[in-house]
């Protein structure tokens, strides 16, 4: 999985830097961007909503390394190809699945509106169990892309 690599010595998570350095790599120069979530923990992550006149996207700063991202990407593609409704990583202009900026990895997916799972709601629990069963069933033959982190279990 190829990456776009940019290195700067300033705050990579500022909206200005996201708009100036990250969005153009996805041909989103004229988009607006807003921060939705930020967690400043050991596994720092952030979520941005990117909007154009016709589409909305989710730009995520992920906390894992390239090999783990490759495993996650492998799993997402496997689930998608087995008819599970998962977001797909949108490639950059150079067909990369992520962008590396200030040693941070960013991915872009379509924006998906939805409700947070309410574990007190029997309908939500039933749907979650059905989906988990489908994931379990199609994952039996899963194999990750070469070069990704090997996970067992």
Language-model-derived ranges and their functions:
Residues 1-91:
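Conserved NTP-binding catalytic cores of kinases and kinase-like/nucleotidyltransferase enzymes
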Residues 30, 40-42, 102, 121, ...:
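Solvent-exposed, flexible loop/coil residues
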Residues 46, 99-103, 132:
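Short amphipathic alpha-helical patches
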Residues 71-75, 85, 104-105, 124, ...:
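Generic hydrophobic, aliphatic-rich segments that mediate packing or membrane embedding
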Residues 82, 92, 108-115, 131-142:
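Mid-sequence acidic-hydrophobic segments that form the walls
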Residues 93-127:
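Conserved structural core of kinase catalytic domains
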Residues 122-153:
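A cross-family kinase active-site recognition segment
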């Amino acid at each position: 999985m190829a990456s776009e690599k940019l290195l700067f010595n300033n705050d990579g998570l500022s909206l200005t830097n996201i708009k100036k350095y990250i969005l153009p790599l996805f041909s989103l120069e004229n988009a607006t961007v807003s921060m939705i979530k930020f967690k400043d923990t050991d596994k720092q992550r952030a979520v941005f909503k990117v909007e154009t006149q016709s589409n909305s996207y989710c730009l995520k700063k992920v906390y894992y390394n390239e090999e783990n991202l490759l495993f996650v990407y492998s799993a997402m593609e496997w689930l998608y190809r087995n008819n599970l409704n998962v977001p797909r990583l949108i490639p950059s202009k150079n067909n990369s699945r992520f962008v590396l900026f200030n040693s941070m990895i960013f991915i872009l997916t379509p924006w998906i509106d939805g409700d947070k799972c309410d574990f007190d709601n029997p309908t939500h629990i039933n749907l979650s169990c059905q989906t988990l069963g489908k994931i379990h069933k199609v994952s039996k033959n899963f194999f990750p892309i070469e070069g990704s982190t090997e996970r067992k279990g």
